[in-house]
Amino acid sequence: MDKLFVYIDGTARGEPGEAAVGIAITTPDGSVVEEISRLIGRTTTEVAEYRALTEACRHVIPYEPSSVVFFTHNQRLANYINGVFETREPHIKHQIEIALGLLNQLPRWRLNHVDQKVNMRAPRLVEQAFHQSLQAQATRERMELVLLARVATLSDDAMQRLLDYADRLREEE
């Protein structure tokens, strides 16, 4: 593959809080190669931004592009990765080292700071990860309520069989 454009974003809901990354990998003409939208656990927005960059690198490297242009609306991330500024925060230094280690596996790369309007796709993917998580949680809660309602109507013998069956299911996982 010749050249790829990669749009990245990472956000936490709370500082720290549940965090997600959004990554859009495209060709220069805008054709989508891959989109990543996923929760990454509990962290800060700053760390989530670096995690978006490192995860983007891990997805891009197998395509073996001749060059990659990354886009972020996080000026601080762009400045640190591009060596404009240095951080004194050890946990951020560690994130930078990881990112640079992956970036340097690419033949040519560049990280550009862009206006948030240019980088709209990645934040939408972040929101998609949060939304899917909420939907999954709501679905699970509904299933639990239905299960509780049905269990409440069972006889003691049927409830014991259900408990035995649940134990077998847990052992299989």
Task: Pin down the residues of each PLM region.
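A detector of short terminal or domain-flanking linear segments
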Residues: 1, 28-31, 108-110, 131-134
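RNase H-like nuclease fold core
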Residues: 1-47, 58-62
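RNase H catalytic domain
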Residues: 11-15, 54-130
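Short coil/turn segments at secondary-structure junctions
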Residues: 36-40, 83-86, 146
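Loop-to-helix element that buttresses phosphate recognition and phosphoryl-transfer chemistry
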Residues: 48-52
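Intrinsically disordered, low-complexity regulatory segments
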Residues: 120-148
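Short, low-complexity, charged amphipathic interaction modules
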Residues: 140-173
